[in-house]
């Protein structure tokens, strides 16, 4: 985990130095590891992809409680939420997270799931009731483009 933390720090610093600031009216997205998932490199890469594609992206790690995730998504009027799932034991909290987000007064327009577990078992997206299960951050960015403009 030490090396992962160093990689994540390097990605964040480089991104901070090189990435353009999003426009004031940019659509909001939230990318996070589900509660209990400490693997943040994939979600961090998606955060960078979406930001450079014109989104205002809130990045949350797996230490963020579900209640805080829901509150922040609501406060920011988030259009898109991306959840990263690493292992089978995170499946129940992922299902709960999606259900809780969908029950919000203003739910996000789309909820994507990704990460190692979803990549190895894409059929889980239906069980989780996600809108999409992109296999890579690039694919997630491309799918997210349909939610960038308001209807």
Question: What are the functions of these language-model segments?
Answer:
Residues 116-151:
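Peripheral docking tails and interdomain loops at the edges
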Residues 20-23, 75-77:
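Glycine-rich phosphate/diphosphate-binding loops that line cofactor/substrate pockets in enzymes
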Residues 49-52, 59, 64-126:
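Cofactor-cradling patches in redox/metallo enzymes
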Residues 3-6, 10, 42, 46, ...:
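General structural feature for long, well-ordered alpha-helical segments within catalytic domains
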Residues 1-22:
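Long amphipathic alpha-helical segments
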Residues 26-60:
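Glycine-rich active-site/cofactor-binding loop and its immediate structural neighborhood
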Residues 19, 25-31, 70, 104, ...:
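Hydrophobic/basic alpha-helical segments enriched in Actinobacteria
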């Amino acid at each position: 985990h030490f090396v992962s933390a160093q990689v994540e720090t390097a990605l964040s610093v480089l991104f901070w130095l090189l990435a353009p600031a999003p426009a004031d009216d940019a659509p909001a997205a939230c990318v996070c590891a589900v509660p209990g998932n400490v693997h943040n490199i994939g979600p961090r890469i998606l955060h960078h992809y979406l930001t450079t594609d014109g989104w205002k992206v809130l990045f949350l790690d797996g230490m963020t409680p579900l209640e805080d995730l829901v509150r922040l998504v609501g406060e920011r009027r988030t259009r898109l939420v991306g959840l990263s799932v690493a292992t089978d034991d995170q499946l129940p909290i992922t299902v709960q997270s999606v259900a809780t987000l969908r029950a919000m007064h203003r739910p996000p327009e789309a909820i994507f799931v990704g990460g190692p577990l979803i990549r190895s078992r894409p059929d889980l997206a239906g069980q989780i009731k996600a809108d999409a299960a992109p296999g890579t951050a690039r694919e997630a960015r491309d799918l997210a483009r349909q939610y960038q403009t308001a209807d």
